[in-house]
């Protein structure tokens, strides 16, 4: 038995913010709103131009020691009563700083294709991350990772409930979820904004998430009923905003 392989697979199962299904659904939604010019530019950069596939690359690479320096790019932790603009910024970076770095690189005509591919895959992923409220959580509980709860009787934590459990319990593929989102939400209703405003929006949402759950709570169907619509809206919103961001980069 290959225990090393089993260990790696187990570790990867804990490394997918929004979960693989959520991230890929967001990428799939974004593809519906790209301009033709943006599509062509993405095809020049990525061997596989699928944004759904690109969306999980940044998590898949986290088991690589060379990518550990980018771990802080996936989130930002700050006090619940302090806006990001007024908070102390981490020297290791955070999701807002990382999105800005990616956008700057993709607009740089002197950047290599390899650099652009790296930053494009990261950008697709990070726009999803910033819309998961617990990626804008409190440092003291590591974005809900230290809030232990029961999910249908099984031990887990609040962060994982939002990342994967609620989405995965509906047993939809990412394409089915993306179609469901587009059939239930309208892109024209989404306020686009930028990452500086997205972070404020997610902070407001995470304060609500924290207010509803305590350590050792038991969660199940009622919690799904109360929160899945918000999760779906966040996934769809991330997709629409990702498309707008990419169109602004590649088709100004």
Task: Please place each PLM-identified region on the residue numbering.
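Bacterial Sec-dependent N-terminal signal peptides
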Residues: 1-21, 25
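N-terminal, motif-rich segments that launch catalysis or mediate targeting to/interaction with membranes
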Residues: 18-124, 133, 138-252
